[in-house]
C-alpha cells in the first residue's frame, strides 16, 4: 500500500502539481478495500 501512495505523490511532485480530488478519492478507496480485507482475515482467525 505504501508503494501506491509513494507512486501517486511522486508523479504529482514530478509534474509540479497537487494531488487531484480523484487521486485522493482513489487512494481512500484503496484503503477502505484493504480494511475490509483485514477485517475478513481477522474474523476468520
Curated annotation (Swiss-Prot):
<keyword id="KW-0472">Membrane</keyword>
<keyword id="KW-0042">Antenna complex</keyword>
<protein>
    <recommendedName>
        <fullName>C-phycocyanin beta subunit</fullName>
    </recommendedName>
</protein>
<dbReference type="InterPro" id="IPR009050">
    <property type="entry name" value="Globin-like_sf"/>
</dbReference>
<keyword id="KW-0793">Thylakoid</keyword>
<dbReference type="GO" id="GO:0015979">
    <property type="term" value="P:photosynthesis"/>
</dbReference>
<comment type="function">
    <text>Light-harvesting photosynthetic bile pigment-protein from the phycobiliprotein complex (phycobilisome, PBS). Phycocyanin is the major phycobiliprotein in the PBS rod.</text>
</comment>
<keyword id="KW-0813">Transport</keyword>
<dbReference type="InterPro" id="IPR038719">
    <property type="entry name" value="Phycobilisome_asu/bsu_sf"/>
</dbReference>
<comment type="subunit">
    <text>Heterodimer of an alpha and a beta subunit. The hererodimer further assembles into trimers and the trimers into hexamers.</text>
</comment>
<dbReference type="GO" id="GO:0031676">
    <property type="term" value="C:plasma membrane-derived thylakoid membrane"/>
</dbReference>
<keyword id="KW-0605">Phycobilisome</keyword>
<keyword id="KW-0249">Electron transport</keyword>
<comment type="similarity">
    <text>Belongs to the phycobiliprotein family.</text>
</comment>
<keyword id="KW-0089">Bile pigment</keyword>
<dbReference type="GO" id="GO:0030089">
    <property type="term" value="C:phycobilisome"/>
</dbReference>
<keyword id="KW-0157">Chromophore</keyword>
<keyword id="KW-0602">Photosynthesis</keyword>
Amino acid at each position: 500500500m505504501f508503494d501506491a501512495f509513494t507512486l501517486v505523490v511522486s508523479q504529482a511532485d514530478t509534474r509540479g502539481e497537487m494531488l487531484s480530488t480523484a487521486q485522493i478519492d482513489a487512494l481512500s478507496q484503496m484503503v477502505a478495500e484493504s480494511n475490509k480485507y483485514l477485517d475478513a482475515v481477522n474474523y476468520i482467525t
